[in-house]
A protein has these predicted regions:
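Structural preference for beta-rich elements and adjacent junctions enriched in aromatics
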Residues: 1-216
C-alpha cells in the first residue's frame, strides 16, 4: 500500500542554523522509515529514516542513516552521487506527468533534475542548485569507512517550492524517498513507498506515496 502521511508547518525553518535545524526536526517531527527491500537480490537494508516538515517557502527533509559502509567519492554537484552512500527525494511535478529528483550523497554533494524519464531530463544549473540548502554531519571530502567505527551520518535538505514551479506550499505532494549505494560494499536500493517492478528502478512515479502539508 502506498503511504499517505501528514507533515506539519514549521515557520521559517530554512533560516535556522544547522545545529538548531537538527534539534527542531528531531523534537518536532516524526521519522518515516525508508525500509522497503523491493528486490531480493539486494537484501542489505541500512537503518534509514527521513523527517519532514515545511515552511511557507521550502520542503525540509532530514535523513538519518546507519550503515556498515559509508562511501563518499563524488565532490562535484550533478555527478554520479547514486554510486556513493546516497539518499534521494523524488517529487512529482504538480503540473504534469514529469517529476523532480533531488539526490544527495553522504558528504552533501547534490544532483537535481526535472525529468521526463530515467534517461530524459534537464539537470539543474548551478544557480538553481545553490538555492537548495544542504548540509551533512560529515565533512565535504572523500570518505570510505570500511573497517572503521564510523557507521552513522545525517544529511539535511531544504527544497524551495519555487523550484517545483510553486508560489507557495501546496496541499500535498506525491513523492518517494530512497537510499542507495551502487558502489558500496553491499549495494542496496531501499524505498519509502514500495515499488512493484522486477529490477531496481526509482524512476517510477506510479509508485509514489503522498505527503499532505497541514497548514494549521
Amino acid at each position: 500500500m502506498k503511504p499517505n502521511i501528514e507533515i506539519h508547518h514549521i515557520p521559517g525553518i530554512e533560516r535556522l542554523e544547522d545545529v538548531e535545524f537538527v534539534k527542531v526536526m528531531t523534537e518536532h517531527t516524526s521519522p518515516e522509515k525508508v525500509h522497503n527491500v523491493n528486490w531480493a537480490e539486494y537484501s542489505y537494508a541500512p537503518d534509514v529514516a527521513v523527517n519532514l516538515a515545511f515552511s511557507d517557502n521550502v520542503l525540509a527533509l532530514m535523513y538519518t542513516v546507519k550503515e556498515e559502509h559509508i562511501l563518499g567519492t563524488v565532490l562535484e554537484d550533478n555527478g554520479p552521487v547514486w554510486e556513493d552512500s546516497c539518499v534521494e527525494t523524488f517529487i512529482k511535478d504538480p503540473f504534469s506527468d514529469n517529476y523532480y529528483n533531488f539526490e544527495v550523497n553522504c558528504i552533501a554533494t547534490k544532483l537535481a533534475a526535472h525529468r521526463r524519464s530515467r534517461t530524459d531530463c534537464d539537470l539543474f544549473p548551478t544557480e538553481k542548485l545553490n538555492e537548495i540548502r544542504c548540509f551533512s554531519s560529515l565533512p565535504h571530502e572523500k570518505t570510505n569507512t570500511i573497517n572503521t567505527d564510523q557507521k552513522e551520518w545525517l544529511v539535511a535538505l531544504m527544497i524551495p517550492f519555487r523550484l517545483l514551479g510553486l508560489e507557495s506550499a501546496p496541499d500535498f505532494l506525491d513523492v518517494n524517498f530512497y537510499k542507495c549505494g551502487d558502489n558500496c560494499r553491499q549495494p542496496h536500493y531501499l524505498s519509502w513507498s514500495p515499488i512493484g517492478l522486477p529490477e531496481p528502478n526509482f524512476h517510477c512515479p506510479e509508485f509514489f506515496g503522498r505527503i499532505n502539508l497541514i497548514k494549521k
